[in-house]
Amino acid sequence: MKTASKNTGPTLFMAPRPLRAWYQARRVCVELEGGRILRFPITGNPRLESASPAQLGRIRLMPSGLHWPDVDEHLSIEGILRGDYGQHA
């Protein structure tokens, strides 16, 4: 006899926290909890594209993402995992 599973509503997705982040060769690299490393290009994000390498290297880790205070840009880890790297021109 099969029993119906109970639908308790939408499942919450908790993106892993960033442990460290750096800028290298026109890409942002992020090491996440669990050891995964993400790399994504700065192209397509006007704020990051117009920033100097020094500004791009000043990344603040936030519980849910990355912040570049010099260029007032914030990207969430959840968005990065979806392929959303910020504002598009």
What residues fall within each predicted segment?
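Motif-centric detector for short Cys/His coordination patterns
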Residues: 1-89
